[in-house]
Amino acid sequence: MALACMRQGATWLGVAQLHEALRLREYLDAAGVKPVDATQLAQNPALATAQTPRIFTWIMPPVSAQEAAQADSGLRQALRAKLDLSASTVEVLQAIIAAAKAEDTCAYVHLKVDTGMARAGANLEDLADLAQCAAQAQSQGHIKVVALWSHLARADEILIPATGQQLERYRQGLQILADAGIDVPVRHLASTAGTLWHPDTAALDMDRFGIGLYGLSPDHTVARAQDLGLHPIMRLEARLTQVKHIKAGQGVSYGATWQAPTDRWVGLVPLGYGDGILRSAYDRAPILVGKQRTHIVGRVCMDQV
């Protein structure tokens, strides 16, 4: 997916988990895709091209500053891999600073403000402390604040004011950073739904497409994927390990929640909730067997349906 996005002009690649971002860097290196030149980046912290994309990651195991400074810490690996990192709290930022000092390098950081998702991000009343910490570290050359970012909670609900309210809180966050002497070169807020249905959020410097990259609509009641020009790009495949004939009235799987109304053929697929299939999918989730459309019957087991 990363290479496909780059071919279409993507200059940033967002990966949630730090360990995934490190793997992506290895993959890009093997494909001959190198990070932005360090000297050029120092001159232009927003620099990113489709040939030398930036990798941004935002979920990292919690570590203290002392742990972050250790040679094998994930944060030091991230800095060696030239990853952009997110900080929502002073504690996380201090860990990034410690890793940067240990690596004798500059960390490129995206500060996150919570504008209404109530997930990661500093509350507006706490953002000033985070900004002051960042400004001091930036003046010492340990970090560069690349961006202020946030995430939309209800962008798929196009007729309510929540997204506009989040945008206003985001702008307040920008002012708090400006008051601390931080001028961020990159601003990003819009998700797939924001990009599609809230142009004010998409008018910033970067949009983060998530569900849209998988070819799905954020809300099919607003617009179906095909109406948006989106096509699903993923599917899960497995071979049937057994096909058997059962009699009418025979219960299938735990609790016999589904019983055959007539004599039936059933097939066994070696995938279950241990592989990510929801347990709630029983008796309704669609399956294609060859070109024949059918559905899961009986409860989803750990390793079989």
Can you describe what each PLM-predicted range is?
Residues M1-H188:
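Active-site-proximal beta-alpha core segment in soluble small-molecule metabolic enzymes
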Residues R7, E20, T39-Q43, P61-A65, ...:
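Active-site anion/phosphate-binding pocket segments in diverse small-molecule metabolic enzymes
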